[in-house]
């Protein structure tokens, strides 16, 4: 994932920042409690495609 792209992307729900997951397969929105998948290098920023974060993931800094 291009870091320049990550800098300009925002969560479509909260308009807050996104963080790249450790395995670089998801964009994490702590504010919305969602993880948006990255498929073939393209972030899928649809709420219907996002996964809900676990309680542990929500607390992880």
Curated annotation (Swiss-Prot):
GO CC terms: cytosol
InterPro entries hit by this protein: Trm112-like (IPR005651)
Superkingdom assignment: Bacteria
Pfam families: Trm112p
HAMAP family to which the protein is assigned, alphabetical: UPF0434 (MF_01187)
Family note: Belongs to the UPF0434 family.
Record protein name field: UPF0434 protein PSEEN1604
Organism: Pseudomonas entomophila (strain L48)
């Amino acid at each position: 994932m291009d870091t320049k792209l990550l800098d300009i992307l925002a969560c479509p729900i909260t308009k807050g920042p996104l963080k790249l997951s450790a395995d670089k397969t998801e964009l994490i929105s702590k504010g919305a409690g969602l993880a948006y998948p990255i498929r073939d290098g393209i972030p899928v920023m649809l709420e219907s495609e996002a996964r809900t974060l676990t309680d542990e993931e929500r607390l992880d800094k």
